[in-house]
Amino acid sequence: MIRVLQDGILEPVPFFLLHHQHSALECDAAFAAWQGFASPLRRQPAVSSCLAGGHAVWWRVETPDRGAALALLPPYVAHRTDAIPVRDVEIP
């Protein structure tokens, strides 16, 4: 997605990799936190290592900034999540 800045310059909207981690004991709470929370990420597939014993979840989101990226998550999940700016690259 491209956004237009005030001076008319085109700029790509940043992508963030949301990397959430929780302990095995927090797994149920991390998933329950989504109940009643409105987000476009709900009911969508996410990459997770929970069923493999790693207890991490990753989302790739397109938002203007880190705060907007973390706002897509329920507070319980957001407090345990890093929002990492990422860009696509071609691998030679």
State the predicted function of each range.
Residues I2-P92:
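Conserved, structured core segments of small domains
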